[in-house]
Design a protein with these regions (language model features):
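Nucleotide-state-sensitive switch-loop elements of NTP-binding domains
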Residues: 3-14, 19, 23-119, 125-130
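Polar low-complexity intrinsically disordered regions
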Residues: 1-2, 147
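Short, hinge-like loop/turn segments at secondary-structure boundaries
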Residues: 56-58, 139, 194
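Phosphate/Mg2+-binding loops and adjacent switch elements
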Residues: 93-171, 175
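P-loop/Walker A phosphate-binding loop and immediately adjacent motor/lid segment at beta-alpha junctions
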Residues: 13, 158-195
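Residue-level signal for alpha-helical context at structural boundaries
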Residues: 42-43, 138, 165, 185
């Protein structure tokens, strides 16, 4: 493998199915990253399609590929980036897959020379969030524990404190934002450019 001349700064967006991961990615792409060359890796596809734009490319991998050949998947990503570099890579991670699989693929293999994970965001739907997380088990807790911040889709502005308390029990340092806090989330998230 040739020496890779550019690191792919990476944001990992994780959460359970139907939590709003693609919705958040689409909003980031439309409102914040429209001038950025972005590669999106999807390890699950929800109901909402990823937006199509000139600056957005995507690679989709199935759960079966991820489980059987995670290092082959990482190798394909590296080869793709060698041919078509990106300013930023967004990984839409499978919400019930152990986070250590992602770490092994991109942080403790040859891919670590290419990939720099700069942000890890846990996305949740505020409706029945706690019970869905409890039912999902250990992989979900490991994702929350490793996340920098959480973005929660809520219908009510008043449910933030309850959600925050629950997430802090998994990760005391996690910053919690709701869909009603977009300006605060944006300001915090883009205070420092990682790409």
């Amino acid at each position: 493998m040739k020496v890779f001349e550019m690191r792919a700064f990476t944001w990992v967006i994780t959460g359970l199915l139907d939590s709003g991961k693609t919705t958040l990615i689409n909003r980031l792409l439309k409102e914040e990253l429209s001038d950025t060359n972005v590669l999106v890796l999807q390890f699950e596809e929800g109901e909402e399609p990823l937006i199509q734009a000139d600056n957005v490319r995507k690679l989709v991998f199935s759960k079966k590929e991820l489980e059987k050949e995670p290092f082959s998947v990482a190798g394909k990503v590296i080869l793709y980036l060698e041919k078509q570099p990106a300013d930023l890579m967004l990984i839409e991670w499978n919400g019930i897959e152990h986070f250590h699989t992602l770490e092994e693929m991109f942080l403790s293999s040859p891919a670590q020379m290419v990939v720099t994970v700069a942000r890890l965001i846990y996305v949740a739907d505020g409706g029945h969030m706690e019970s869905r997380i409890m039912d999902a088990g250990l992989p979900t807790f490991s994702q929350i524990a490793g996340s920098d911040c959480a973005y929660i889709r809520t219908k009510s502005r008043h449910s933030r404190s309850e959600r925050k308390e629950f997430l802090h029990s998994c990760n005391p340092g996690i910053k919690v934002y709701t869909s009603h806090d977009w300006k605060h989330f944006r300001r915090e998230f883009f205070a420092v450019k990682f790409y």
